[in-house]
Amino acid sequence: NKSETTYLSRYYKYEGAAWYSRNIEIPADWKEKHIVLFLERTRPTTVWIDGREVGKCNYLSTPQEFNLTHFLAPGSHKLTIRVDNGKSIPGQIRSSSHACTESTQTNWNGIIGRMELQAMNPLFIESIQAFPQVEDRSVKVKITLSNSSGIGGKKLQLSASAFNTAKKHKARSAEYNLKEGSKEYEFTYQLGDNAVLWSDLQPALYQLKAEINGIDEKTVQIGRAS
């Protein structure tokens, strides 16, 4: 046996497909919920529910999410995940990327970190993008909702506060009306004249929260360069 001391070593090396399967139970109160399979970190995957293919994902450095809503009803189901650290990863990445090389983390196989089935309301905040505008101390906020039906009359609230600065600042919250049939929105949210600016010596950050009252909320961090 050859001993290796210049990088990580393993008892066994494997490249190819690995299969993981287990029975899951969906509770009755998840009926009509939006259900997502969340895999925090893995290799290229294919997912099946009860033998029906849900989809594929090849993310290596970010979480993978699969929408299982139309595959799961309350009751028993079989979840199967195929993870492939072989030819599903391009050869150049396998041979030279820090995500795969023996001198860093190796070309491991499997699923690590959080592995969850997440159930949420059919209406939720799918994404939020924030673009600080230094000139008028505002933030352009782009929001995408999960769907556009059943939202008429509901409101979305934006709020923001500095959280890592000696000088505290909390912007005045603002409410916006949601329109039936619209799932994408763009707002200009004012932080106020006393908003704290980001610099390399004082990297002031804000937590910007978007909330649909009693339904869902999402928070992102932003900074406004001086």
Describe each PLM feature range.
Residues A225-S226:
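Conserved small/polar residues in nucleotide/adenosyl-binding loops
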Residues P74-S76, G153-K155, S182, L201-L205:
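Extracellular Ig-like/FN3 beta-sandwich strand-entry sites
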Residues A119-G150:
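Surface beta-strand/loop "capping" patches
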Residues P63-H70, K183-D193:
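Exposed aromatic-hydrophobic patches
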Residues K168, G214-E217:
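Short, exposed coil/turn segments at beta-strand boundaries within extracellular/luminal domains
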Residues V47-I49, S138-N177, K183-F187, L208:
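Beta-strand-rich binding/interaction modules
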Residues K78-I81, Q202-G214:
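Short, aromatic- and glycine-rich surface loops/edge beta-strands on solvent-exposed regions
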Residues R10-I125, S148-S149, H169, V220-I222:
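Accessory beta-strand-rich segments of carbohydrate-active enzymes
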